[in-house]
Amino acid sequence: MTYQVFDTTLRDGGQREGISYSVADKLAVARLLDEFGVGFIEGGWPGAMPKDTEFFRRARTELDLRHAVLVAFGATRKAGVDVAEDPQVQALLDAETPVVCVVAKSDIRHVERALRTTGEENLAMVRDTVAHLVANGRRAFVDCEHFFDGFRHDPSYAAAVVTTAIEAGAERVVMCDTNGGMLPSMVTAAVHAVVERAGVPADRLGIHCQNDTSCAVANTIAAVEAGVR
């Protein structure tokens, strides 16, 4: 049985207090991760962070990865904006990475309060962005932000975000415990529900757990035992 590791050190790890990578730092860490045999390296958010834009520019000529695939991270198109006209989506394509990972809201409360749009528009944002990336030759991953909190509040909507991404062509959909408040039993139940009720193959799912309650490793193991690869 094969498992794939998607490393977020250069993006999520840089959000930790006291951490600020230079472009040279990011290139050096990427080389080490590649030596470790990591499958995917999330390099940062081009277009949103100037250092990340520069990292991807330099990576084209300065990184010779033998094992890992470099990934650009960003967001779905904005509400009410044509995906082909969204500058942030274009920045993801301009990074010229084989894989692009976009974050999507999967908690309907955040869709309505943070994005200030409807559930249907959010699904369209996911659908349009994934389809656009795939049409432009990219492998698309989707991070479902606050998935488990959203699933506890409205399981049907959270699952709909996953299925929308898969149907649009996403290679992998990552369920995120963004607040780090889940327990292994909650993770197991949510994974089983998405697989059994929504009909999403478990090997198309990923897991990303924060460690606020020191359960990230246990929750990740629970997801893997439930079939996530």
Explain the meaning of each model-derived region.
Residues 66-73:
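A glycine-rich helix N-cap at a beta->alpha junction
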Residues 208-210:
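Histidine-centered divalent metal-coordination motifs
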